[in-house]
A protein has these predicted regions:
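Active-site-adjacent loops and short helices of periplasmic peptidoglycan-processing enzymes
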Residues: 1-111, 118-121
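Domain-terminus/edge residues, biased toward the C-terminal soluble/receptor-binding domains
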Residues: 99-291
């Protein structure tokens, strides 16, 4: 998503492959040092096939180095609300930085990242276009070599509610899958980490189907504000009346405030308002907030 947002603001569309990018281990595209590729083609390579060399080539071009790009990743993750991430590489391999901090992210943060990519980023439509592509053939800029890419997200063709998804594997993390789901006006992001190790490559699909069904069966939209809620009257100093009533007053565009909840869940709403006001006080005056 950093690369897509970069492309919105910059005119350069191609990448020359470095020695470091070309020397990445499998799974890789097999690019060679000095070859030139279109950035967007390498994003298909990255998102459909998880090619390590494509990830490094894109990172070096946008960040100047893998290390600088990793810092951009960490900064972006914090901006969108992630709390437990430490990105060291653009391809997610099991490595540590110079201080010994291992490349890592929690399941909750991976779900937050997918939420941003699939629903919130200004480039979310392009992200979905790439990740929903079943297959694609790309070439280097010269047209001398062609590469066939196939999407490994099996649920795209099996479950209509699967909007996007990305598979992954490392020796420490096991088989992983992060997905965005949407159906009947409900949307969810789900992150599965450690869904088995070889040879159990298909466990993640069964686990995702269970969570998919659970989410749509269990969560429904509820209006979280109690329209009948009453508040204690507030003292008005130096006023004609000694006290005034408070009411919940939502803007017209938010007369309903819906949240996906289980039937047994109650939202934790905190009302903040003063215990006294100074005159003059006007009808409709905002004196507190709900959070």
């Amino acid at each position: 998503i950093l690369a897509l947002e970069y492309l919105r603001k910059h005119s350069d569309q191609t990448i020359e492959v470095s020695d470091q990018a070309a020397s990445q281990p499998k799974v890789h595209l097999g690019m060679q040092k000095g070859e030139v590729f279109y950035i967007k083609d390498l994003l298909y390579s990255l998102m459909l096939e998880s090619h390590n060399d494509s990830a490094v080539a894109v990172a070096e071009h946008i960040g100047g180095s893998v290390e600088e790009f990793a810092e951009k990743m960490n900064r972006k993750a914090r901006e969108i609300g992630c709390k437990n991430v430490c990105f060291v590489t653009p391809n997610g391999l099991d490595v540590a930085d110079a201080d010994g901090n291992e490349h890592s992210a929690s399941a909750a943060d991976m779900a937050r990242i997918m939420r941003y990519c699939a629903f919130q980023s200004p480039c979310h439509e392009t992200f979905l276009e790439i990740t929903r592509t079943a297959s694609r053939t790309i070439q280097d800029e010269s047209g001398n070599r062609s590469f066939y890419l196939a999407n490994h997200n099996a649920l795209l063709s099996q479950c209509a509610e699967v909007l996007s998804g990305k598979t992954g594997f490392t020796g420490k993390a096991g088989y992983c899958y992060v997905a965005a789901l949407k159906k009947e006006g409900k949307a969810f992001t789900v992150a599965l980490l450690g869904c088995g190790w070889p040879p159990h490559k298909t466990y993640k699909w069964a686990d995702m189907r269970k969570l998919d069904q659970y989410a749509f069966d269990t969560y429904n939209w509820y209006d979280i504000f109690d329209r009948e809620k009453t508040f204690p009257e507030v003292e008005v100093r130096r006023g004609v009346k000694g006290t005034t009533a408070l009411t919940l007053n939502l803007p017209s565009e938010k007369q309903t405030f819906l949240m996906l909840l289980r039937a047994d869940e109650k939202p934790d709403i905190r009302y903040e308002y003063p215990t006294e006001l100074e005159a003059p006080v006007h009808e409709g005056q905002e004196v507190g907030q709900a959070s």
